[in-house]
Each structure stands twice: as structure tokens, then as C-alpha cells.
């Protein structure tokens, strides 16, 4: 008779191998196929159902980069990851800076996630701050940096980023808040959307706080300093994958 621990270990290995294979297939498939949903969307939907909130629905509408305004692409880079074109998924200078700042200040720790890390985390992983999830996030980040172009990473990020309660992706956010497609977003509208990205449940696009409005103006200045639309073209971020 098989030892129950051996039986459990056998199935745990089976599950782990299956998950790894699924991740590999997903990385390859999503390098060219539209992403239908992210793990964050699934997690939010299940959480709503468990809370008996059946009115909640995760909305997302995939669009290719050719249907996304350069303004929003530049805005999220200016707001979230200005070294995005140069790094291989990790901004070690930002990580070091955040570690020093967190050591000197009490309270909630701040992160230093790049756009690549946020894409890997939101697309493939559950929410949380465990070392296991961080390790998996690092591996998935390296995988998409290796297998996808920077343009593709940015396109996927813009399609799965959360901009409000049940609002995922720039197309859905643009329609919901501004009643237009993502291709028609102005610089000011794009900066406002990017301003809530750190915490779209705390910061609101439709009722922005003074902090959000200040952040919007800061993002607009950073967009100009980066060079506007020419920055995207110069760094090969305008290719429609």
C-alpha cells in the first residue's frame, strides 16, 4: 500500500508540473494572441461572488497597440516606469531607493515594480506579498522579457491594468470615464488614468482628489520631459504586435 505522504507528494508534483507547463504555453500564446482575462480579474470576480456581490462584473475590451493613443502609452511609462525601454524587467536603482526609504520610514511599505513586473503579476499570479509569489513574479517577469518585445509587454499591460472597480484595460477605462475609444485619449485624460494606477480602489478617475490632480500634472510634465510621442518611436514602442 502506498504511503499517504508519497501519494500526496506524487500529486503535488503533478500539479506543479502542470502549472509550469500552462504558464509556459500562456507566455508563448500571449506573445501574439489577445489576452482574454488576467488572474487579477479572476480573483476580483471570485472575491465578489464569495461576498455575495453578484452585481460586480470584471469588464475588459482588448485592443491592439494601433488602437491605443500614444498619450496613454507615454503616460503610464512616465508614471510607473521611466526606465522601461532600457531594463530587463527589474529597475535595481529604484529597488535600492525604495529599500532605503522603507528602512527610514515606518508604516506601509512602498514597492518598486516595473511595468514588466506588474504585467507578469497581474496576468499570471494571485494578489499578495509572500516570498513565494515574489519569486514566481521574478521568474514570470524574466520569461516575458525574454519572449516578448517591449512593445508587446506594454500593449498587454495597457489591456489588463486596473483603472477602477471592475474596469480593466485602457479601452474599457476610456469608454467608461471619457465616453470615447482609447485611440482618442488626450494627454490630460491619459495622465489622469495613469495617476490612479498605484491604487485604483483608493484613487478615483471620476472624482479625483487633490493628490490625484497633482499627480496628473506631474505626469504631464514627465511626458514632456521624456520627449512626447517621439520617445515611443525612438524606443521602438510603437510597433503593433
Swiss-Prot record:
One CC-aspect GO term: peptidoglycan-based cell wall
Topology of this chain in the membrane? Single-pass membrane protein
Q: What does this protein do?
A: Peptidoglycan polymerase that catalyzes glycan chain elongation from lipid-linked precursors.
**Which species is the source of this protein?**
Photorhabdus laumondii subsp. laumondii (strain DSM 15139 / CIP 105565 / TT01) (Photorhabdus luminescens subsp. laumondii)
Xref: InterPro entries: Glyco_trans_51, Lysozyme-like_dom_sf, PBP_transglycosylase, Pep_trsgly
HAMAP family documented for this protein = PGT_MtgA (MF_00766)
EC number assigned by the record: 2.4.99.28
Q: Which family does it belong to?
A: Belongs to the glycosyltransferase 51 family.
Give TM regions: 15-35
Q: Which domain of life is it from?
A: Bacteria
Which EC class is the enzyme in? Answer: transferase
Pathway, per record: Cell wall biogenesis; peptidoglycan biosynthesis
Catalytic reaction annotation: [GlcNAc-(1->4)-Mur2Ac(oyl-L-Ala-gamma-D-Glu-L-Lys-D-Ala-D-Ala)](n)-di-trans,octa-cis-undecaprenyl diphosphate + beta-D-GlcNAc-(1->4)-Mur2Ac(oyl-L-Ala-gamma-D-Glu-L-Lys-D-Ala-D-Ala)-di-trans,octa-cis-undecaprenyl diphosphate = [GlcNAc-(1->4)-Mur2Ac(oyl-L-Ala-gamma-D-Glu-L-Lys-D-Ala-D-Ala)](n+1)-di-trans,octa-cis-undecaprenyl diphosphate + di-trans,octa-cis-undecaprenyl diphosphate + H(+)
Which is a Pfam family this sequence falls into? Transgly
- Protein name stated in the entry: Biosynthetic peptidoglycan transglycosylase
Per UniProt, the keywords (alphabetical) are: Cell inner membrane, Cell membrane, Cell shape, Cell wall biogenesis/degradation, Glycosyltransferase, Membrane, Peptidoglycan synthesis, Transferase, Transmembrane, Transmembrane helix
Subcellular localization, per the record?
Answer: Cell inner membrane
Any GO BP annotation: regulation of cell shape
Amino acid at each position: 500500500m502506498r504511503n499517504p505522504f508519497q501519494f500526496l507528494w506524487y500529486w503535488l508534483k503533478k500539479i506543479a508540473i502542470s502549472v509550469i507547463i500552462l504558464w509556459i504555453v500562456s507566455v508563448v500564446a500571449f506573445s501574439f494572441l489577445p489576452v482574454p482575462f488576467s488572474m487579477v480579474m479572476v480573483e476580483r470576480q471570485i472575491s465578489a461572488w464569495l461576498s455575495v456581490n453578484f452585481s460586480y462584473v470584471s469588464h475588459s475590451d482588448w485592443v491592439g497597440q494601433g488602437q491605443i493613443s500614444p498619450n496613454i502609452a507615454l503616460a503610464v511609462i512616465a508614471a510607473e516606469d521611466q526606465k522601461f525601454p532600457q531594463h530587463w524587467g527589474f529597475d535595481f536603482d529604484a529597488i535600492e531607493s525604495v529599500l532605503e526609504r522603507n528602512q527610514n520610514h515606518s508604516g506601509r511599505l512602498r514597492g518598486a515594480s516595473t511595468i514588466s513586473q506588474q504585467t507578469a503579476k497581474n496576468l499570471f499570479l494571485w494578489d499578495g506579498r509572500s516570498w513565494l509569489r515574489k519569486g514566481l513574479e521574478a521568474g514570470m517577469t524574466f520569461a516575458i522579457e525574454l519572449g516578448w518585445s517591449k512593445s508587446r509587454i506594454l500593449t498587454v499591460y495597457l489591456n489588463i491594468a486596473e483603472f477602477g472597480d471592475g474596469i480593466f484595460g485602457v479601452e474599457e477605462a476610456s469608454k467608461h470615464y471619457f465616453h470615447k475609444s482609447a485611440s482618442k485619449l488626450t494627454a490630460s485624460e491619459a495622465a489622469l488614468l495613469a495617476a490612479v494606477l498605484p491604487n485604483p480602489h483608493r484613487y478615483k478617475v471620476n472624482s479625483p482628489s487633490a493628490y490625484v490632480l497633482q499627480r496628473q500634472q506631474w505626469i504631464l510634465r514627465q511626458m514632456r520631459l521624456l520627449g512626447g510621442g517621439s520617445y515611443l518611436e525612438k524606443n521602438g514602442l510603437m510597433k503593433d504586435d
